[in-house]
Every structure is written in structure tokens, then in C-alpha cells.
Swiss-Prot record:
Enzyme Commission (EC) number: 3.4.17.21
Gene this chain is encoded by: gcp-2.1
One GO MF term: metallocarboxypeptidase activity
Organism of derivation: Caenorhabditis elegans
Full protein name: Glutamate carboxypeptidase 2 homolog
Co-factor: note: Binds 2 Zn(2+) ions per subunit.
Length: 770
């Protein structure tokens, strides 16, 4: 019994196993005593309970966790990494199908149970690999003066020899060509478009030039198309991806910085999941609720041609732009001292055109699922996940995570086989397909099994990829913050330099590099979008943890993000040079979290902390937001009244959470006295599991994203990578600002009331009676 209380042995076995026989010999027990012990074991569990052994439950958990961590080996991670990144493997291709079955094979060989794939038929997008996309600049006389390559060059042939690996493209870009003046719009945020208009520059009928960073690329294109652009170009600025300079000695493969023809690929879909089957799983036998034309009309798929270019091509465009200089915070480092201008058009009458070759196709994708069944609560799921599809080789995103997850599975099964440890709750391993196109595999899975997940899933723990080598970085919901912090204290710091400075654990460096304003706490953000945790939290109300390793930098992600240069060379020689010690630490942290949630008697969920965050952080933020609404005094009083009622409910939640904490303490004490009577434990844990579900609004909180149903933490409408606190309230305020009507005012109040209803739901969930 993995989570038995004081009195359990550190190595528990079957009563008929060899270790048990040795124990009987060692203690020279009488036959009567043996009979009693055997009877007790048969009645209760295959795991022993010896009242003479004073080992505590914490000792047992720490010992088992230590064995699992010791069993995680870097040589295995390296082996898996090379297997999974041998070829380019875009979702929907035979190469990615092969990776799926290699993952399934690795998990099966490790000993996971019921390893299988789950297929879906989804709309994907591919370029014409025989005809690269291009940017062409012609003189006023019609002579071609510049043409982009459209293909990134091979730099390490042993790892980058796949056919078409260098092709530069963006999924779901509109097929076709566009010729027009160019307008520079910085990062393409909502404020950037607003400021461009204030500066008197019109984007209608133009080609938008935008930098990567500060938001999801699909949102940039969505805004550009809404503003009337007929095409768009995205480029990486050297101030983000080549900070040491663009010379060969300062970029890949000498350093981690992007080389001069590197390009970030990605998806432009505005939303998550299959574009043609919102709300429902995209199974072959089910009807598609939306057509391609409707998806374009709804803004889910772009209609205009779009392509990514290198900073070398970006320079060729920027140096020709006419018009007034861009604002200082719109300037970058492409071309060194080059001053970015807004346009429209070029100074010397030259003309630009873009040619994009893109095709939409329905393809089969497949998720991979495997289990370690729990010995006590097999219907309680601790879910671990990572996606495996990549834009090219994907050795960083995502297959650094894929390799680590395979090793976590192997190490756990090794521990099970060599000791008597087995998790109390079921650990589910998930490898998602087509994440890069818009979280498709995970979203379809959640849509298919949402009712089961809301009953069985305890937590979903996601690790997309390893982004740096300095510090752990964790996003999670407030109810899980204590758990992620405590787990980080149990894993040794992978950096020798950090350990020499007295920072022995992941927690120590995390606290140093990413401190919160609150003393003694590392910075933890609410999860946004951009990876497979999003549908679990936003659609199903399953609490999530999304973690990685990062550097303390000013750019959004690592410089080689979504380039063809993500091959094992980058992991081993540029990113994690001490024998993949960061990869190993990531695996140890993943395993520590999984084991904690699988084996802790009471689930490590803290509703008191959540209530405190609600009162001290979320409500003051909401108060500031509603104070800025332009309404009459009487109308504002109506809003303020509803806000006060929400505040009262949040205070009730804090009071009830403190009372519920007393119930938890009583339950833990009772369990330590009689670990074979878990009914009180089950009652407490069922309430804890249900709290996050209270915030799911079946009607949704976003018109644009059907996966957004969480009234507190749904993904932002303006940036799919970010979370939006109380998105329904914010969306109602935005709508009112555009069209101030009485109905719009009532909707603001209604959305505040919906948040209050969810808080009341948590209060009622924690009560003993209705």
C-alpha cells in the first residue's frame, strides 16, 4: 500500500515473496504470528504493515522518490533523443507516424501497460516543397534586384540531410501571391496596430512586415488581415536571435544564436484543435461541423499569403522602406545602425511581391497513450504529457521533452521491477500529435474524453521542451503552487557552478533567478496557451503544471526556435553541455511531481492559498480594470455592487478553506491510525479534485476559441500564448468600449456574476453539507 501511514516498511512486498520470507526468518516469528500477519495482509493489501517498524510515511516517499531519480540516466535520454529526431517529422507525415510508433515501442519495452494510439482525422497544411516560397523585389523598370532563398542551408550534414528540411513556410498561410507597398508594424500587437493608425499610416491593401516576439504569430496575422492587409511577412530581429552579432563566429554552430538564413516556422491558425470540428473530437465517423470556407470567414484560418523570412531578407526590405522613422521602441538591430521606417513603399520606386505555395489537406494524426496503473486508486489519473511532432527535426522543441518523458517511464518501471514501489494512483503517459499546428492532438483528446477527465484526472503535468540551461521555470494554478515549489526542493541542481555557490537544488536557483515580489517565493505565472496543457485547464478544468528550463533573457524563447538547426548537436554542444545534466534534472523533477500526486495520502492542493490569491491579487486587478470603464456614476455603482458581492464570496471561500484545512488535518491523523480505512481520505480528495472544475463555464468565455471555458484563467483573445484573468469580464469590457450600450453594460455585470457563481461553487464543494 504505497501511501500507508506510520508503521509501513520502507520495502513492502507480497506476503508470499522472497523478501517477506527473509523478514520472517530475521525476526524468528512464531507460526501464530506469521499466520496473523498473513491474514492481515490478505485482508487489506499485498503491501505489508508492520507495527514494530517506526519508519514514517515521509521516509517511505523520500526513499522511493530517490530511487526513481537515481534510475534516470542521461545516456538513455541521449539515445531516445537521437531515435526521435533522425528525420524531419511534421504532423500527418509518414515520418511522424514512425516517431509515434517508436515512442510506443520505447514505452512498451519499458513495461508500460496498455500502450496504444488514438487516431484523429484533422485539417493540416503543407507547402509545395518543390517550389519554395519567396520574396521578390523589382526595380521601377521591372528588373529583379532581390529574391529570397526560401530554403535554409544545411550546416551539419550528418544531422540535417533530410529532403526539404530547409523549406521556409508557415502552416495555414493563404495560397497565392501579393504585390503591394510594405508597411512595418513592429510586433503586430493590438497596440501596434492602434499606434500605426494614430501615426496616420494605413495598412489596407498593403503587405504587413512584422517582427516575431511579444505574442502568437497567428494573432499577428489575424489582426493584419482584419486591418485590410493583403499579405504579410514575419522576420526574426537580430536583437532577439543574434545578440552577439551576425558574424559566423557569433552564431550557430559556434553559438546558440540563429544563423543568417535561419527562419522560425509555425502555425497561423487562430484557435486550438481541428479547425473543422470545434467542440467535438475529429473522428473519422463523426460529422465536421465547419467547412474550410467557414473557418476562413470566422477568422480561424487566414486567407492572405504569409511567409517567414530570415533577418538577412528582413534587412533587404527594411533598408528600402520609405516614410517616417518608426518609434524608438519599434527599432531593432537588423543592419546594425539601420533606422527602421514605417513605409508605405520603398524610397526608390522598387516594388515587392510575395509568392506563397500552400495546400490544406485532411490527414490522420495519432496520440500515444500508456499507463502505470495505480494500486489503490486506479481511476485517479496523474497525467504526464509532451508532444512529439516537429516543424523539422525538433531536438529541442519538442523532442528534448519526448526523450525525457520516455526515460521517466523507463525509470519508473525499473523502480517498480526492482523494488516493491507502485504508485497508489494511475500515472498516464501521453505523447501528443499535431501540437505545432494548434494543440490539435491534445485538444481532440480532451474533447473526446472530457467527461471522463473531469471525473478521473487529478492533474496534468506538461513539459513541452527545454528552452535554456539556467533555471527551472514553472507555470501553474494557485491551488498547486505549494506542490511545485516543494518538489523543486527535492531535485539536485544540475549546474556545478550553482552548487558551488551554495544553491544545491532546483528551488535555490529558481528563487535566485526568477524571484517573485513576495519574499521567499519564486515567480509562478498562471499558464497561458501555446502548449498541450491549455485544453486540459481551459476546456476541462483539470489543474495543470507547465514547466521548463529557461535563461534569464529578454527574448521570448531560445534563438533556434522552430528552425532546422534543432538537432542533437544543439542539445549536447550548445544548450546542455554538461552531459545533458539539465535534461536529467527535468526528468527528475517530472518524476518527483508525478510521484507526489500519485502517492500523497491527501492530494497536494491548497484551496486556502487560492482564496488568498483571489483576495489579494485577482480582485484588486479586477477593481483597477473596472475603474477604467467610461460609464456614468449610476452605471458604475451597479458594477461596483456586483464587484462587492464577488469580494464577499471570495472572503467566504477563504473562511471555508481554513475550516476545510482542519478537516484535512483530522483526516491525515485518522489515516495514520488506521491506513486501511480510506473513506475519509477519499471524501477529502474528491472535493479537492472538484474545485478547479467549478470555474468551467460550458457556454465558454471567448467567441474565438471554443476551448476557452475557464472563467478565471482562459487564454487571452488578443494573444493565444498568454492567459487572461477573468477573460469573460475583459471581453465584455472590450465590447462595451467599442459599442457602449445598456446591454453591453449588463453583460459586464453578468460576467462578474459568473465569476462569483464559480467561487460560490468552490465554497459549496468544500462544505460538508449542501
Amino acid at each position: 500500500m504505497p501511501y500507508v501511514g506510520v508503521g509501513a516498511q520502507t520495502v513492502s512486498t507480497s506476503l508470499t515473496g522472497a523478501p517477506m520470507v527473509k523478514a520472517y526468518i530475521a525476526i524468528a516469528a512464531s507460526l501464530i504470528f506469521v499466520f496473523c500477519i498473513a491474514a492481515l495482509g490478505v485482508h487489506h493489501s499485498e503491501r505489508k504493515f508492520n507495527k514494530f517498524n517506526k519508519v514514517s510515511i515521509d521516509d517511505i516517499h523520500k526513499s522511493d522518490a530517490g530511487v526513481i531519480q537515481d534510475n534516470i540516466k542521461t545516456e538513455n535520454i541521449k539515445k531516445y533523443l537521437r531515435i526521435f529526431t533522425k528525420d524531419p517529422h511534421v504532423a500527418g507525415t509518414e515520418a511522424n507516424k514512425k516517431v509515434a510508433y517508436e515512442i510506443a515501442n520505447a514505452w512498451s519495452e519499458a513495461g508500460l501497460e496498455d500502450v496504444h494510439t488514438l487516431p484523429y482525422e484533422v485539417l493540416l497544411s503543407y507547402p509545395d516543397f518543390e517550389n519554395p516560397n519567396s520574396v521578390i523585389i523589382k526595380s521601377s523598370a521591372g528588373k529583379e534586384v532581390f529574391k529570397s532563398k526560401g530554403v535554409s542551408p544545411v550546416i551539419i550534414p550528418d544531422e540535417q540531410s533530410g529532403k526539404y528540411a530547409g523549406h521556409q513556410w508557415l502552416a495555414y498561410a493563404g495560397n497565392g501571391s501579393a504585390s503591394a507597398d510594405v508597411v512595418y508594424i513592429n510586433h503586430g500587437t493590438a497596440n501596434d496596430f492602434k499606434n500605426l493608425k494614430l501615426m496616420g499610416v494605413d495598412i489596407k491593401g498593403k503587405i504587413a512586415l512584422m517582427r516575431y516576439g511579444h505574442g502568437f504569430r497567428g494573432d499577428k496575422i489575424h489582426k493584419a488581415q482584419q486591418a485590410g492587409a493583403i499579405g504579410a511577412i514575419l522576420f526574426s530581429d537580430t536583437q532577439d536571435v543574434a545578440q552577439d552579432g551576425v558574424e559566423s563566429e557569433n552564431v550557430y554552430p559556434k553559438k546558440i544564436w540563429m544563423p543568417n538564413e535561419g527562419v522560425q516556422r509555425g502555425s497561423l491558425m487562430h484557435g486550438d484543435g481541428d479547425a473543422l470540428s470545434p467542440y467535438y473530437p475529429s473522428k473519422k465517423e463523426l460529422f465536421k461541423g465547419r467547412t474550410i470556407e467557414e473557418a476562413k470567414e470566422d477568422g480561424v484560418l487566414p486567407s492572405i499569403p504569409v511567409l517567414p523570412v530570415s533577418y538577412t531578407t528582413g534587412y533587404e526590405i527594411l533598408k528600402r522602406l520609405s516614410g517616417r522613422p518608426a518609434p524608438s521602441d519599434w527599432q531593432g538591430f537588423v543592419g546594425g545602425n539601420l533606422t527602421y521606417k514605417l513605409g508605405p513603399g520603398f524610397v526608390n520606386g522598387e516594388k515587392l511581391s510575395i509568392n506563397v505555395h500552400s495546400e490544406l489537406r485532411t490527414k490522420r494524426i495519432r496520440n500515444v497513450i500508456g499507463y502505470i496503473r495505480g494500486s489503490e486508486e486506479p481511476d485517479s489519473y496523474i497525467m504526464l504529457g509532451n508532444h512529439f511532432d516537429a516543424w523539422v527535426y525538433g531536438s529541442i522543441d519538442p523532442n528534448s521533452g519526448t526523450a525525457v518523458l520516455a526515460e521517466v517511464a523507463r525509470a519508473m518501471m525499473q523502480t517498480i521491477n526492482e523494488t516493491s514501489w507502485k504508485p497508489a494512483r494511475t500515472i498516464v503517459f501521453n505523447a501528443w500529435d499535431a501540437e505545432e499546428f494548434g494543440l490539435i492532438g491534445s485538444t481532440e483528446f480532451v474533447e473526446e474524453f472530457v467527461n471522463i477527465l473531469q471525473k478521473r484526472a487529478v492533474v496534468y503535468i506538461n513539459m513541452d521542451c527545454i528552452q535554456g540551461n539556467i533555471s527551472l521555470h514553472v507555470d501553474t494554478v494557485p491551488i498547486l503552487e505549494h506542490a511545485v515549489i516543494e518538489a523543486s526542493k527535492q531535485v539536485e541542481n544540475p549546474s556545478k557552478r550553482e552548487r558551488s555557490r551554495g544553491r544545491k537544488t532546483l528551488y535555490d536557483t529558481w528563487m535566485k533567478v526568477f524571484p517573485d515580489k513576495k519574499a521567499g517565493v519564486p515567480k509562478i505565472r498562471v499558464p497561458g496557451g501555446g502548449s498541450d496543457h491549455a485544453p486540459f485547464l481551459n476546456f476541462a478544468g483539470v489543474p495543470v503544471i507547465n514547466f521548463t528550463f529557461k535563461n534569464y533573457t529578454t527574448w521570448d524563447t531560445y534563438p533556434l526556435y522552430h528552425t532546422m538547426y534543432e538537432t542533437p548537436f544543439s542539445n549536447i554542444h550548445l544548450l546542455d553541455t554538461d552531459n545533458l545534466s539539465v535534461h536529467k534534472a527535468i526528468g527528475q523533477y517530472w518524476a518527483e511531481l508525478a510521484k507526489t500526486f500519485a502517492d500523497d495520502v491527501i492530494l497536494p492542493m491548497n484551496t486556502t492559498h487560492f482564496a488568498s490569491v483571489m483576495l489579494k491579487t485577482y480582485l484588486p486587478q479586477l477593481k483597477t480594470t473596472i475603474s477604467g470603464i467610461n460609464v456614468s456614476r449610476s452605471d458604475f455603482e451597479d458594477i461596483r455592487t456586483q464587484y462587492a458581492l464577488l469580494s464577499k464570496s471570495a472572503q467566504d471561500l477563504l473562511t471555508m478553506s481554513k475550516k476545510f484545512q482542519e478537516t484535512i488535518h483530522f483526516t491525515q491523523h485518522s489515516f495514520s491510525q488506521n491506513p486501511y480505512d480510506p473513506k475519509h481520505v477519499n471524501a477529502v480528495n474528491e472535493r479537492l479534485k472538484s474545485t478547479e472544475r467549478c470555474f468551467i463555464n460550458p457556454r465558454g468565455v471567448s467567441m474565438h476559441n471554443p476551448s476557452a471555458r475557464h472563467v478565471l484563467f482562459s487564454v487571452s483573445d488578443s494573444d493565444s500564448y498568454s492567459s487572461s484573468l477573468m477573460a469573460g469580464v475583459q471581453n465584455a469590457i472590450n465590447s462595451y468600449d467599442l459599442n457602449p450600450t445598456k446591454k453591453g453594460l449588463r453583460e459586464i455585470i453578468n460576467q462578474i456574476s459568473i465569476v462569483q457563481y464559480s467561487v460560490i461553487c468552490v465554497v459549496n464543494t468544500l462544505r460538508d453539507v449542501i
